[in-house]
Swiss-Prot record:
Glycans are attached at residue 467. The chain crosses the membrane at residues 470-490. Sequence repeats lie at residues 229-240, 246-257, 265-276, 284-295, 299-309, 318-328, 332-342, 346-356. It is a single-pass type I membrane protein. This is Calnexin homolog. Calcium-binding protein that interacts with newly synthesized monoglucosylated glycoproteins in the endoplasmic reticulum. It may act in assisting protein assembly and/or in the retention within the ER of unassembled protein subunits. It seems to play a major role in the quality control apparatus of the ER by the retention of incorrectly folded proteins. It comes from Helianthus tuberosus (Jerusalem artichoke). GO terms for molecular function: calcium ion binding; carbohydrate binding; unfolded protein binding. Residues 491-540 are cytoplasmic. It comes from the Eukaryota. Residues 30-469 are lumenal.
Length: 540
């Protein structure tokens, strides 16, 4: 009895640690997520659709195909779309790490169109969200774009020249390609305080760059110190020829420029059996003049030609001619040999002068993000945007990507495992049954009292799912131990009723066991922050 009591206390302590860790993780995540849009609720009133005539495309609050999760959907083909969300407070990019992340699913593929986001800088006075269009100034443009030869994940920084005051688009060189499947993918851009940029797709690093490197951005953020002098001109006597014909060379006396390249082969002989009197083609004896043929209008009718059947067994027909062969005396046009040019000065270049627009830069002049917009002409429908996140911590975004966005990768692996490990999965079905048997026995414990009905309801709900989930089992255990805690430490006070039925909004948390196991295998030990709460969905 004493041993059982000790085990019970250990279980209680373990569950307490788990609950405390979850609370701390949630607090950390909420503080690091500057902006998060899950599209669980309708976007109307929060996201503003452009009222410009150029953007007739209709946005829809729709579920992803085969999922219970909602997103922002491009609903029609060959339409221009524009929608924007103004942030409560502009996000500064100059200090600390900033993570830009979102999910997109190309449900019908992407032949020609974009699925990128525009992170708008503060607009001029008088600008309204209803007037959002392609001229609305942005700070960063990020996301997939594909059309014709273009197939890349854009990252464009619109940077203000500190000398001229002009804004210049700086494109990331050699960006990663867009995944070609129709699954959900997470696109992440991490802007670090050391001027480093990291692009990830589904949590996997695809590109690393430095904002101040001329090898990573075109044009470079920092201009060159010198430029070619636009007023400098090449001297008239400047000789750029490295080689010249030898002026002292003469053509040899035996060099015949008129000799032909080919001559008749005088040694050739006509093959035996050659039919000199037989033509190579003859009139088709089976051809008949058409009845509607009019000689006056169509001309004299002639039978079509066919190959002479007599020539098939002979080496040839018709007049025999000697074949040609290469002329051994042929040398072609004579040219003087080339020698080094004594007057050669090299390829002329204008002299370099100090660049009047040069400036030094320790950090890019990032403009704040005041709004997030989607604006493009899409030839495909079925583009679904979801889980748009701006965070100040990489772990928050990484956790979000692993738990919410890397479904495509996890489900590919899962499907491979289902085929490979079918015998193992058959064994797991027996384990599932045993687990539910234990849970039903726990539900019959006397101390549950009034809570027994709720616990049974939750167990039955989990059992009716296609596959049980670890999340549901853990929830049941936590509820039971929470009741036990109150019984042990709550004194004589009546235990309040516990609502153990998950909220309707969070019911989809009971997702597939294999998916959860897959997520657990992919988690790394360094993850400590949790993503904003979100209903998971699966890709099929």
């Amino acid at each position: 009895m004493e041993l059982s009591r000790r085990k019970m206390c250990c279980y209680i302590q373990f569950c307490c640690f788990v609950l405390i860790g979850c609370f701390i993780s949630q607090i950390c995540a909420s503080s690091d997520a500057i902006f998060y849009e899950s599209f669980d609720e309708s976007f109307e009133g929060s996201w503003i659709v452009s009222e410009k005539e150029d953007y007739p495309g209709e946005w829809k609050h729709s579920k992803s195909e085969g999922h219970d999760d909602y997103g922002l959907l491009v609903s029609d083909k060959a339409r221009k779309y524009a929608i924007v969300k103004e942030l409560e407070k502009p996000v500064e990019l100059k200090d600390g790490t900033i993570v830009l992340q979102y999910e997109v699913r190309l449900q019908n593929g992407l032949e020609c169109g974009g699925a990128y986001l525009k992170y708008l800088r503060p607009q001029d006075a008088g600008w309204t969200a209803k007037g959002f269009d392609n001229e609305s100034p942005y700070s960063i443009m990020f996301g997939p774009d594909k059309c014709g030869a273009t197939n890349k994940v854009h990252f464009i920084l619109k940077h203000k020249n500190p000398k001229s005051g002009d804004y210049v688009e700086h494109h990331l060189k050699f960006p990663p390609s867009v995944p070609s499947d129709k699954l959900t993918h997470v696109y992440t851009a991490v802007i670090k305080p050391d001027n480093e940029l990291v692009i990830l797709i589904d949590g996997e690093e695809k590109k690393k760059a430095n904002f101040l490197s001329s090898e990573d951005f075109e044009p470079a953020l920092i201009p060159t110190k010198t430029i070619p002098d636009p007023d400098d001109k090449k001297p008239e006597d400047w000789d750029e020829r490295a080689k010249i014909p030898d002026p002292e060379a003469t053509k040899p006396d035996d060099w015949d420029e008129d000799a032909p390249m080919e001559i008749l082969d005088e040694e050739a002989e006509k093959p035996e059996g050659w039919l000199d009197d037989e033509p190579e083609e003859i009139d088709d004896p089976e051809a008949v003049k058409p009845e509607d043929w009019d000689d006056e209008e169509d001309g004299e009718w002639e039978a079509p030609q066919i190959e002479n059947p007599k020539c098939e067994s002979a080496p040839g027909c018709g007049e025999w001619r000697r074949p040609l062969k290469r002329n051994p005396a042929y040398k072609g046009k004579w040219h003087a040999p080339l020698i080094d040019n004594p007057a050669y000065k090299g390829i002329w270049k204008p002299r370099e002068i100090p660049n009047p627009d040069y400036f030094e830069l320790e950090k890019p002049n990032f403009e704040p993000i005041a709004a997030i917009g989607i604006e493009d002409l899409d030839q495909q429908d079925g583009i679904l945007f979801d889980n748009i996140l701006i965070a100040s911590d990489e772990k928050t975004a990484a956790k979000s990507g692993i738990l919410l966005g890397s479904r495509s990768l996890r489900w590919k692996k899962r499907n491979r495992r289902l085929k490979k490990n079918q015998p193992l999965l058959d064994g797991l079905k027996g384990i599932q049954k045993a687990v539910f048997d234990v849970l039903y026995k726990i539900a019959d414990l006397p101390f549950l009292g009034d809570h027994k009905v709720k616990v049974l309801e939750l167990i039955e709900k989990a059992e009716t799912q296609p596959n049980i989930t670890i999340g549901v089992i853990v929830s049941i255990i936590v509820v039971i131990f929470s009741i036990l805690l109150k019984l042990l430490f709550g004194g004589k006070k009546a235990a309040p009723k516990v609502n153990v039925v998950p909220k309707k909004k969070e019911e989809p948390e009971a997702s597939n066991t294999a998916e959860v196991r897959e997520g657990e295998e992919e988690k790394t030990e360094g993850e400590v922050a949790a993503a904003p709460r979100r209903r998971p969905r699966r890709d099929t």
